[in-house]
């Protein structure tokens, strides 16, 4: 596991960001995405696809369990960025 940043990297401009290609700019603490969070996201978005919410069917699928929605993962970016960079 990567430890969260001790001191965040300060990026003043987009131009200065280009010079840091390939560098780790920030890390955040791990975030656990449990089934309750997935189910709540499914309710909020109306996306009840089986791979996300049907544990029995998903157990027979390619991942052996349910998986988080891609948009759920994307929706965590503000939380993760805040934890890593502020």
Label each PLM-derived region with a short phrase.
Residues 2-86:
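Hot-dog-fold acyl-thioester-processing enzymes
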């Amino acid at each position: 596991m990567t430890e969260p940043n001790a001191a965040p990297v300060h990026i003043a401009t987009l131009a200065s960001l280009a010079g840091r290609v390939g560098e780790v700019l920030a890390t955040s603490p791990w975030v656990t995405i449990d089934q309750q969070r997935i189910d709540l996201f499914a309710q909020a978005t109306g996306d009840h696809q089986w791979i996300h919410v049907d544990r029995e069917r998903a157990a027979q699928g390619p991942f052996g369990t349910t998986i988080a929605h891609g948009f759920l993962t994307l929706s965590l970016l503000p939380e993760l960025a805040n934890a890593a960079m502020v």
